[in-house]
Amino acid sequence: MATDEYRALAACDAVIICVPTPLANHREPDLGYLVEAATQLSRVLHEGRLVVLESTTYPGTTRERLLPILEESGLAAGREFNLAYSPERIDPGRTDHTIRTTPKIVGGVTEECCRRAAELYRLICDEVVEVSSPEVAELTKLLENIFRSVNIALVNELAQLCDRMGIDVWEVVDAAATKPFGFMRFEPGPGMGGHCLPVDPFYLAFKAREHDFYTEFIELAGKLNQAQPKFCVEKIERTLNQDRKPVRGSRVLLLGVAYKAGVGDMRESPAVKIIRDLRDLGAEIAYHDPHVPELSEFSLSSADLEAELGGADLVAIVTAHPEVDYERVVREAALVLDFRGVTRGIRAENLVRL
């Protein structure tokens, strides 16, 4: 049963907390949703219950933040109720790796807590990996995502260098990927999105500062990825200028605004920054996204692609949804700027790639 009605949890033997853990204004952890959920849960907590946190967070959250709030119930964690952390491991839009087939990490505040949580997850997961503590499980999740963040920052920075050098970054990545060992493929793009990747480096950096340690390399990767949409706006401006058009007054059509292909999730989508900056420069904005019918923040609705293609001064491919015929886009648009590399193999004078 999935619910946000806390009274409905009174009869449950196990509760899994999956609330958002965003960043506050100064890029520090905002655990407000978690604190509220824990406070409400403490009022209906009963002896023998299992509580598992799945929300992405910094090491120590389960033991230092969640546990004391739950113990306001008068029950002791590890003796009268069980508490564990098990990071969410899903990739929205993918069907080849499911909850059942993806190994599940579990760390409890005691061995018994870990055993109880593992017992629960074995009902739905083929493999459960038990670790020694919630802190290990919490940091495991951050490592998985920061590994991606750092490597995406690397190829995004390489893309900016290739832009200056006149080298096709996609050809470089494709060539490097032919090496059967020692290289893992990551692709550049307009920036990172989703509820985890853009956030996680700053969660770890926050906790590291408590220990008088500064994760400079990790934070730099986060900053590079945060800045990538601005580079894309500059690339749009330069591409229009090379076509003898100013960005002010030009009609720019964004193809795809969700943070990744095949989904309608707008959380931390780089398209939002791109639209905002282009509007500040005076551009007229339209977008087409089969998964995002409305952008209320900008009072925009997804436009009919066929109707918009011919009237746009520039079409920017921001999210490469599989439903779109990109050969047709290049054929019918006046100018195309591809930030996702989906036009590799197409040669056309009106086509520019990241």
Question: Where are the predicted features?
Answer:
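Structural/interface elements that position substrates and couple domains in central-metabolism enzymes
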Residues: 1-354
